[in-house]
Amino acid sequence: MKNNFSHTPVLLNETIQNLDIKNDGIYIDATFGYGGHSKEILKHLGKNGKLYSIDQDPYAIKIANKLKNDTRFNIIHGKFSNILKYSNKNKIRGKVNGILLDLGMSSMQINNPNRGFSFISDGPLDMRMNPNTGIPAYMWLKKTNLTTLYHVLKKYGEEPFSKKIAYNIIAYNKKKTITRTLELSKIITNSIPIKKYRKHPARRVFQAIRIYINHEIYELQQALEHVLNILIPGGKLLILSFHSLEDRTVKKFMIKYSKPPFVPPGLAITETQLKSLANKQLKIITKIFPSTIEIRKNPRAHSAILRVAQKNNNE
C-alpha cells in the first residue's frame, strides 16, 4: 500500500534547540515514528556525528530504511524499553549527548484505519504498535472480564463513565464479538451522555485500551531506568508527552533524580560518603508547551508537554 501520510513533529524547533546538537555528537531518537525529528537532527549533525533511532513499528522501519545511505544514521527495530541493550550493543553506553523520546502517536498510525487506532474511521480493532507481536485489541476485549476492563478504563483513560462503558462492552461481546473500531466507538458513545464531552466520547477508552495492550507506561518506566547510564555527563534528556499519565511518569522520574537521596538524622556516615550522596544525577532545565499558533496549525499539539533535563557531571 502506498503511504500518503504526513506528520508534523510537535515542538520541533524547541526540541532541536534544547538538544543543543554537537557537530560530532551521538544522539538517540528513541521513537523514530515518521522520522521528522531524526531527519532534523541529521541536518544539524556533522559528518562524524551519529544518530541511533529506535522504533518497534515495522512501517516506521520501512520509512527509516530510506535514510540507510546516510552513514551517520542507524535504525534499530525494537522497543525503546531496551535502550540500554541497544546502547551496549553499539558501544555507546555513557557516550550519548542527547536522548529524545516523543511519546505521541504518529499521524501515520492514527490516520491508517487498518491499524485500529482511530475511533472515527472504520477498521479492524487492532491497536498494536507492532502488528507482528502481542494480541490485538478485539481479542483482548473478548477474553477480559468486567473488573479488569473497568480498572483499565479508569486507570489508563481516566474515564468517568468507566463502569457503564465496561459493562456495555462486555455485554455486547457476549452476543457478538466486537471486531471493528467504529463498532466499539458506537458502544462507547451510546453508553454516556454526549453533552458531558467536548471531545469525542470514545477518545479516553481507545487511549486506555491502547496503553494497556502495548504496555506503554511500563515501557516508558523501563526506558527511564536506563537513560542516566547511557548519557554522557552534560548530556540532554528530552521527553515529549501527550497525556497526563505519561507526563506524571516523566515528571516523577526527573524530580526523583534531581534531588539528593534522603539521609536519616544520626546515621553514621563519613564526609566523603555524605558528599557522594549529595550529588544530584539530573538537572531539570525546563518544560515547554506549544504556542497558540502551533496548536492552530497542528491541533494534535494541544496536549503536548516537552520536559528537558541534563545529566549532571558529578565526577
From Swiss-Prot:
Origin, by domain of life? Answer: Bacteria
- Enumerate the subcellular locations listed in this protein's record, separating them with semicolons: Cytoplasm
Q: Which UniProt keywords apply?
A: Cytoplasm, Methyltransferase, rRNA processing, S-adenosyl-L-methionine, Transferase
Would the keyword rRNA processing turn up in this protein's UniProt record?
yes
From the Swiss-Prot or TrEMBL record, what is one GO molecular function term? rRNA (cytosine-N4-)-methyltransferase activity
State the family named in the UniProt similarity comment for this chain: Belongs to the methyltransferase superfamily. RsmH family.
Respond yes or no to whether keyword Acetylation is given for this record.
Answer: no
Q: What does this protein do?
A: Specifically methylates the N4 position of cytidine in position 1402 (C1402) of 16S rRNA.
Q: Which Gene3D superfamilies does this entry report, sorted A to Z?
A: Putative methyltransferase TM0872, insert domain, Vaccinia Virus protein VP39
Sorted alphabetically, the Gene Ontology cellular component annotations on this record are:
cytoplasm
Q: What is this protein called?
A: Ribosomal RNA small subunit methyltransferase H
**Binding positions for S-adenosyl-L-methionine?**
G35, G36, H37, D55, F80, D102, Q109
**A GO biological-process term:** rRNA base methylation
Q: List the disulfide bonds.
A: none
Catalytic function, reaction form: cytidine(1402) in 16S rRNA + S-adenosyl-L-methionine = N(4)-methylcytidine(1402) in 16S rRNA + S-adenosyl-L-homocysteine + H(+)
Look up the EC number in the record and give it.
2.1.1.199
Q: Which HAMAP family match?
A: 16SrRNA_methyltr_H (MF_01007)
